[in-house]
Amino acid sequence: SIGHIRPYLTNEATKTLVNSLVTSRLDYCNAMLTGVPNTLVNKLQRTQNTAACIITRTSRYSHNTPVLKELHWLPLKYRIQYKTLTFTYKALHDQTTDYIRDMIKVYKPNRALRSQDSLSLVVPNVRTVSFGERSFVHAAPSLWNALPHHIRSSETLSTFKKLLKTHFFLVCYSHII
């Protein structure tokens, strides 16, 4: 366990170890966790919280939000949304495979409306909340349409990622001074 060898590691070595062993596992295919019940996401969040406490040498019983903010880490719920929205951006800009691109439909009204330039996506109707709303086909447009327009209209992927992470960071940590 990293916690047992932590006294012998520098801060940089600990960050590298945690990033390679813990964070990489949390981020691997986490877009598949879209719509998973909060009880399951919270279990994974506890793993991220423990890793953050090991890096910063804080008590595991202390409040985790300031620790995550100090490390510039998004909570797992927002990391999942970040990955889903990144796939969505890539699909809209022809930077991903055809089968993902085919899942996303751009909203085009039949007549002239103010919303025609909003870069919105069509959210398909679903029959079941448990499976339908969890699917990428439904979740991606819902998350995309909730973003501010200046983020959706980003010119490059790197700009989009930067603005999206800043947006999520403000949403998560704006209540902390």
Predicted regions and their residues:
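Hydrophobic/basic alpha-helical segments
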Residues: 1-177
